[in-house]
Structures are given as C-alpha cells and as structure tokens.
A protein has these predicted regions:
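Class I SAM-dependent methyltransferase SAM/SAH-binding core
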Residues: 93, 99-148
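A short SAM/SAH-binding and catalytic strip from SAM-dependent methyltransferases
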Residues: 158-172
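A C-terminal cap/extension of S-adenosyl-L-methionine-dependent methyltransferases
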Residues: 245, 255-311
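Acceptor-substrate binding/catalytic loop of class I
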Residues: 227-242
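A short acidic, Gly/Pro-enriched loop at the edge of an enzyme's catalytic core
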Residues: 151-159
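Conserved class I S-adenosyl-L-methionine
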Residues: 40-87, 101, 105, 189-220
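A short glycine-rich, Lys/Arg-flanked "PGG" loop and its adjoining helix->strand segment in the class I
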Residues: 174-189
Length: 311
C-alpha cells in the first residue's frame, strides 16, 4: 500500500495493494536453523522499490490489518489450497515474500519453503517470525531479485507463489517468468499476481490528461508514487491476455487468469462486518471467476500456470 502522502501527478498513477518487491541488497543474518543467502541481480542501478520497502517493513503488517485484507487473504488461500503439493517432502517458494504471509502458511502446512525478497528489511521481519517457529529449520531466506536467482536450483519447487505483484514491480517480467519456469519442477504450479492494466484506466480518465492516457494504453507502464521521489518506482501492468502470453512464452501451460477481487468491496467495508458475510462474498467471487471477462474489472490479476512434462 502506498504512503498516506502519495499524490498522483502528470502521467503517473499511484498503484496500491501489494505484498512484494525485487532487487539485490546486503543483509544481516541471524536466527537459528535458518539458512541465508545473498543473491546479486548483476544490475547496479538505483533501486527505489527496495528503499521504499525497506522503509515500510516494520509497519507493513499493520498497514494490511483490516477486514478487507482478511477477506482478500481468505480468497487467495482458497485459490492456493487446491494446488498444495500432495507430497509432504515437496519444496515450495514464496517470491516477493514481504513479511512472509504466504510462505509461513506453506511452512505451517509442512513444506520446506524458500522465502525470497529484494528488501533486506522484509527478510529481517520473516527471520523474526521464524525464531520461535518449530519448523524454522525447513525455511531458507534469500535476498534477491526475481529476475535472476542463480542460487535457486533447477527443477526445485513443486509450488511457487509470487503474490503482491512482483511481476509488476520487477525490471523484466519475462525474465522473471523464465526464472520461475527454470526452478519449478515438471508438473509443478506457479501462482502469481500482477497489476491489472484495465483497472488503471480510470485514474487517467479522472486526471483529464488524454496524452497521458494514450501513453499508458500504449506502454502499460505507470509509477508507484510516494512523497519521497527517491522511492518512486516503475510498474508494469497487464491485461488478462498479456499475462497469459507472458507465461506461455516461458513454456508454462496456463490454467487460469482471474481478477482479485472482482467485487469492489473495498468501497464499502460494511459488507465485511461478519465472518458469515465474508464467506458469502468469497463464494460470489468464486462464481464470478468462472467468467474470464470478470477479470477486467479487478484491480489485480492472478494467474495459475503449470510446467508441463517434457516428453
């Protein structure tokens, strides 16, 4: 989520609601039974995204502590759960892990889990949560760029999650998808999210800047804005079709692309006042997801793709 001081200007827009980031950084290691690795991206460039996410790491969980995100997370986990590996010894990865929300769920489910984030402060938050975790020895923490993760072995993971739109934040989404294909096992599954290009159109229309609208439609690129200009970074948005093509070019079989969420409940959180109401809304989301056209109205897209067996 963006700073409260965010102000969209010119051809830029403030995109929101994410759990993720990318890049190469130094880190401090510690904690017992937890392996740490530092992965260099090979690119020495100004990394605004890293600076932003390092700064907000300590308050990150609090930013997303409200009924909307409880609904969002319940919806997400129900989409992930059918793809959990049947083999208890399988390895999983959480790319752009942030403070570890999804990786910790995988770890709790019994899977050896690799947590990857470009922001060292985020990885430190994960480390703190793991210190009292009885499954900590099954966790590997990596500070690195999802575009280039040479220390992740080929054909390693049965399930790879990339939640919070790391594909939109990273410098090269195709390279990131190629990396995912490399380290996903045959018949393994990747579930990833990205910013929806169609949802961002309203911002440009609201600004009344036709030239900016034309540029955005042409490129699909916008920016994450904060009060501190040194923390502003570029975002790549996708349509359902372009996100599917991204994964198909890497060699994946696309199983689904859905919007998340389709129902704009964030505009009226009173709809989420009870667990019973949340359950009803989750069921409605599942029903709407059956229609591919529904994805167009969601702020974010979620793709599920499988790496096929090579015959």
């Amino acid at each position: 989520m963006a700073d409260r001081n965010v102000r969209p200007t010119g051809t830029q827009t403030a995109m929101a609601d994410r759990n993720v980031r990318h890049a190469d950084v130094d880190w401090r290691c510690g904690g017992r039974g937890i392996f740490y690795r530092r992965v260099m991206s090979g690119h020495r460039r100004k990394d605004s995204s890293r600076r932003y996410h390092d700064r907000v790491a300590r308050q990150y969980d609090a930013i997303y502590d409200d009924p909307y995100w409880e609904f969002h997370d319940e919806l997400t986990w129900r989409m992930v759960r059918p793809h959990l590996p049947r083999d208890a010894s399988a390895a999983c990865a959480d790319l752009g892990c942030g403070t570890g929300k999804w990786g910790l769920k995988l770890l709790k489910s019994g899977f050896a889990t690799t947590f990857v984030d470009h922001a060292a402060a985020m990885i430190e938050q994960v480390r703190g949560k793991l210190e009292s975790n009885p499954r900590a020895r099954k966790a590997t923490l990596v500070v690195g760029d999802i575009v280039h993760l040479p220390e992740l072995a080929d054909e390693r993971f049965a399930l790879v999650l990339a939640m919070g739109d790391p594909l939109s934040i990273c410098s090269d989404a195709q390279a990131a998808a190629n990396e995912m294909f490399r380290f996903t096992k045959a018949d393994g599954v990747v579930i990833a999210t990205a910013d929806n290009k169609l949802a961002a159109l309203d911002h440009y229309v609201g600004r009344g800047n036709l030239e900016a609208l034309e540029e955005f439609v042409r490129t699909g690129r916008t920016r994450w804005l904060t009060a501190d200009e040194s923390e502003r970074f570029e975002l790549t948005t996708f349509t359902p079709a372009s996100l599917a093509k991204l994964f198909e070019r890497s060699g994946f079989e696309v199983l689904s692309v859905v919007g998340k969420p389709v129902i704009p409940v964030r505009g009226n959180k009173m709809l989420l006042e009870s667990a019973e109401a949340t359950e009803r809304l989750v069921k409605l989301e599942s029903e709407l997801a059956r229609d591919p056209a529904a994805a167009g109205r969601a702020a974010h897209l979620q793709i599920t793709a499988r790496k096929p067996f090579v015959t």
